[in-house]
From Swiss-Prot:
GO molecular function: rRNA binding; structural constituent of ribosome; zinc ion binding
Superkingdom of origin: Bacteria
Annotated residues for binding of Zn(2+): C24, C27, C40, C43
NCBIfam families: PRK08061.1 (NF005974)
Keywords, ordered alphabetically: Metal-binding, Ribonucleoprotein, Ribosomal protein, RNA-binding, rRNA-binding, Zinc
GO BP terms: translation
Protein's recorded name: Small ribosomal subunit protein uS14
Disulfide bridge partners, by residue number: none
One Pfam family hit: Ribosomal_S14
Known cofactor(s): Zn(2+)
Function field: Binds 16S rRNA, required for the assembly of 30S particles and may also be responsible for determining the conformation of the 16S rRNA at the A site.
Length: 61
């Protein structure tokens, strides 16, 4: 889990537009966040395995 202070800091408006960055909406992780889902790779994988993301299924080939 991310620090509460860093999550609060990311919610405030940035001084410059280049300072804005994405965070996972579920856990607050700043790295490896998918823009389409607003989730980090770990949370996305977890929800996909549980079947909570419509249209997403495990790949097999």
């Amino acid at each position: 889990m991310a620090k509460k202070s860093m999550i609060a800091k990311s919610e405030r408006p940035a001084k410059f537009s280049t300072q804005e960055y994405t965070r996972c909406e579920r856990c607050g992780r700043p790295h490896s966040v998918y823009r389409k889902f607003h989730l980090c790779r770990i949370c996305l994988r977890d929800l996909a395995h549980k079947g909570q993301i419509p249209g997403m299924k495990k790949a097999s080939w």
